């Protein structure tokens, strides 16, 4: 199953959602292999597991640019050279700052969007779950991820600016559904403070819009908290994988993950 996390707005917890859904899958499906492919040049997926993306020897860009394994070699860096095992049953394929120039690189024919797609397809042959963390835009990397996905998760912060962007993403996804009729989409509110009137109003409006557009809307949400960043800072793990997680926040991600699996008609047992 390929799951993309998409929003053209930054700061909505895309990476936090991707890494914690991955952590939840570790607990819900311990026998199944999972991998997160980082398509966001900020490299926050590897940072979420205590890695500095700028100090990693091999990353996604090295595969795309066909970098030799060593000087003078005719053998190029491959997927296996880049994978990092970050938890039992969970790997990541990291990226770094250079991936921010993907559209420029593609326009200069350094590599093609189809090369990225091929990497995703290769991962899907080896892993039960492939999670794609995408950059905050709707450019080539994101469109490639969406075109390959079984489920697209759209985390959004329920503020006054979110609705227009959400509907534009939904409209874009509709074009992919023409070729992939089984594609599922789910909206998930993040940074929610239920005591804030604006948050409740925006969530209600988003639910209505989602229903009109035949898009699933999560029954659960991610609460506003600093505990996720604290987990990464102190334990170098997403909150869903730390040794003594807050039960409330762990359960939020577990329930959201169950919804994603149900949406894709995936039987956990």
From Swiss-Prot:
Domain of life of the source: Bacteria
Family: Belongs to the ParA family.
Entries under PANTHER family matching the protein: P-LOOP CONTAINING NUCLEOSIDE TRIPHOSPHATE HYDROLASE, PARA FAMILY PROTEIN CT_582
Protein name: ParA family protein MG470
Native organism taxonomy: Bacteria, Bacillati, Mycoplasmatota, Mycoplasmoidales, Mycoplasmoidaceae
């Amino acid at each position: 199953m390929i799951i993309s996390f998409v929003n053209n707005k930054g700061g909505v917890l895309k990476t936090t959602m991707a890494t914690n859904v991955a952590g939840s899958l570790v607990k819900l499906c311990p026998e199944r292999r999972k991998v997160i492919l980082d398509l966001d040049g900020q490299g926050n997926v590897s940072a979420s597991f205590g890695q500095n993306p700028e100090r990693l020897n091999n990353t996604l860009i090295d595969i795309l640019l066909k970098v030799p394994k060593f000087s003078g070699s005719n053998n190029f860096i491959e997927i296996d050279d880049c994978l990092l095992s970050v938890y039992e049953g969970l790997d990541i394929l990291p990226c770094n700052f250079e991936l921010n120039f993907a559209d420029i690189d593609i326009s200069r024919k350094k590599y093609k969007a189809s090369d990225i797609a091929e990497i995703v397809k290769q991962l899907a042959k080896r892993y039960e779950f492939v999670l794609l963390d995408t950059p905050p835009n709707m450019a080539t990397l994101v469109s490639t991820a969406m075109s390959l996905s079984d489920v697209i998760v759209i985390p959004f912060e329920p503020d006054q600016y979110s609705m227009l962007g959400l509907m534009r993403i939904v409209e874009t996804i509709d074009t992919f559904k023409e070729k992939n009729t089984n594609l599922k989409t789910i909206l998930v509110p993040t940074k929610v403070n239920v005591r804030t009137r604006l948050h409740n109003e925006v969530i209600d409006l988003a639910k209505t819009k989602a229903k009109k557009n035949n898009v699933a809307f999560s029954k659960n949400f991610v609460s506003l908290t600093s505990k996720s960043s604290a987990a990464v800072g102190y334990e170098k793990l997403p909150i869903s994988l730390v040794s003594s997680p807050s039960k409330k926040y762990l359960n939020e991600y577990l329930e959201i993950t169950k919804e994603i699996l149900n949406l894709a008609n995936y039987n956990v047992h």
